[in-house]
Amino acid sequence: MLDTQQIKEIIPHRYPFLLVDRITEVEEGKRAKGYKNVTANEEFFNGHFPQYPVMPGVLIVEALAQVGAVAMLIKEENRGRLAFFAGIDNCRFKKQVKPGDQLHLEVEIIRARGTIGRGKGVATVDGEVVCEVELTFALGE
């Protein structure tokens, strides 16, 4: 298990854009699981939407990408590198994520060759799928 401080040693994201609180499982270069506790104090709720706070779907995708980045960047040969979005495919949002939810994030790396890879991400709340996506990434310096 990795806490926030340990996650920050692997990926460069910081408040308010670090969207993973814990990594609960990781297999280097293969998969990772983690979660984000979604609180009413999140900056994005100030404008999305003040009377009906909903976590923006693109931030759910970003949270999944950060979990996938941990799976890739925890590998010794990738330490100090960055993981960049190269594509998003087959993205579906199935339910809203609201303050008080614990967003569970799981990414499986389905292909990685050189500096390009692809992962399948699933986000759930209370066991129900809220988002599914295929992520393409590029590793850079």
Swiss-Prot record:
It comes from the Bacteria. CDD domains: FabZ. One of its GO terms (molecular function) is (3R)-hydroxyacyl-[acyl-carrier-protein] dehydratase activity. It catalyses: a (3R)-hydroxyacyl-[ACP] = a (2E)-enoyl-[ACP] + H2O. It holds the Pfam family FabA. Its EC number is 4.2.1.59. InterPro entries: FabA_FabZ (IPR013114), FabZ (IPR010084), HotDog_dom_sf (IPR029069). Its main location: cytoplasm. Keywords: Cytoplasm, Lipid A biosynthesis, Lipid biosynthesis, Lipid metabolism, Lyase. One of its GO terms (biological process) is lipid A biosynthetic process. GO terms for cellular component: cytoplasm; membrane. Gene3D superfamilies: Hotdog Thioesterase (3.10.129.10). Transmembrane segments: none annotated. It is found in: Cytoplasm. It is an enzyme of class 4 (lyase). The active site is at 48. Belongs to the thioester dehydratase family. FabZ subfamily. Involved in unsaturated fatty acids biosynthesis. Catalyzes the dehydration of short chain beta-hydroxyacyl-ACPs and long chain saturated and unsaturated beta-hydroxyacyl-ACPs. This is 3-hydroxyacyl-[acyl-carrier-protein] dehydratase FabZ.
